[in-house]
């Protein structure tokens, strides 16, 4: 089991890429082994306590980005489906307890990790075809922790989720329209030097330009779509994405949460976002009247 004081945790945060990769491979092998599939919620909390500290010890920008991407990929590629909800709960449970201990020098890298975790949850749901039960489990975890109706969960962290939620959903569902040659770093990482390793890894995994359907390399430049064709394709994608179900817990927050400032934040940053109107999730007149 990973502990916050273990040498293994420090290897995950190591500046040497080979050392980091060996530690990450060891972690993924363990989680996919019979022993890993038997982990209980308490065990997963202990695991996340160790992973939390691996980010704590990670000091340089590129290793931080790499580690955040690797920890995010545990959600999209590693954890067995039957353990995913508990693994997700354990992540938030640890962050709920440890958030107030994060100093201003470490805050950005933890915000980046939250972004990666959200992104890779969306990648998993999208890859599995947005199955109703899996979406319901994902939403239930959000309602149980970051969107809970009391003051136990750090409000600043809930604010962050309101800020990034639609950005990350859009990043995932419209991945084929991203310009991989000019893709910029996320806003919270822009002050760091070096490349965004996780953006690179996402691009390699999800970039449709890398290979054709038969596994070969594409030849020449991809055919450029017109704005109308892009809009039509995006509309088709959104029609197949349960955006309303994914946004539903935020609607509940805006109506029932005790914290007035957070209710307003949720409305302004998410529910009033023009993208929801564009995607026909909310009616424009209805949004303005609220």
Predicted regions span which residues?
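Eukaryote-skewed repeat-based solenoidal scaffolds used as protein-protein interaction platforms
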Residues: 71-180
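Eukaryotic acidic, Ser/Thr-rich intrinsically disordered low-complexity regions
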Residues: 1-12, 148, 153, 160, ...
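Alpha-helical solenoid scaffolds in eukaryotic proteins
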Residues: 2-10, 29, 45-54, 70-73, ...
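Extreme N-terminal segments of fungal proteins
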Residues: 1-65, 72, 77
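Boundary/linker elements of alpha-helical solenoid repeat scaffolds
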Residues: 26-38, 51-52, 68-79, 118-129, ...
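Short sequence/structural elements of tandem HEAT/ARM alpha-solenoid repeats
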Residues: 1-3, 22, 39-47, 82-90, ...
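Short coil/turn segments at helix-helix junctions and helix-capping linkers
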Residues: 7-19, 50-63, 97-106, 148-153, ...
């Amino acid at each position: 089991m990973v502990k916050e004081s273990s040498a293994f945790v420090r290897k995950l945060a190591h500046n040497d890429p080979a050392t980091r990769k060996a530690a990450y491979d060891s972690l993924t092998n363990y989680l996919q082994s019979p022993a890993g599939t038997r982990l209980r919620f308490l065990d997963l909390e202990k695991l996340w306590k160790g992973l939390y500290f691996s980010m704590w010890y990670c000091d340089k920008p590129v290793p931080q980005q790499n580690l955040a991407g690797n920890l995010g990929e545990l959600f999209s590629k590693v954890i067995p489906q039957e353990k995913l909800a508990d693994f997700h709960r354990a992540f938030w449970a640890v962050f709920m307890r440890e958030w107030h201990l994060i100093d201003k020098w470490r805050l950005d890298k933890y915000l980046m990790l939250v972004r990666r975790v959200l992104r890779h949850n969306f990648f998993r749901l999208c890859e599995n075809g947005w199955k109703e039960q899996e979406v319901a489990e994902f939403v239930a975890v959000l309602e149980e922790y970051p969107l809970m109706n009391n003051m136990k969960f750090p409000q600043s962290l809930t604010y962050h989720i309101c800020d990034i939620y639609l950005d990350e959903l859009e990043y995932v569902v419209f991945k084929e329209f991203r310009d991989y040659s000019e893709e910029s770093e996320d806003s919270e990482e822009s002050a760091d030097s070096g490349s965004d390793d996780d953006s690179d890894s996402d691009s390699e995994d999800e970039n449709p330009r890398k290979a054709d359907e038969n596994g070969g390399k594409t030849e020449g430049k991809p055919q450029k779509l017109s704005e109308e064709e892009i809009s039509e394709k995006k509309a088709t994608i959104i029609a197949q994405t349960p955006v309303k179900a994914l946004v539903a817990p935020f609607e509940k927050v805006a109506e029932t949460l005790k914290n007035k400032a957070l209710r307003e934040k949720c409305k302004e940053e998410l529910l009033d976002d023009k993208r929801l109107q564009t995607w026909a999730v909310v009616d424009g007149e209805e949004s303005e009247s609220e």
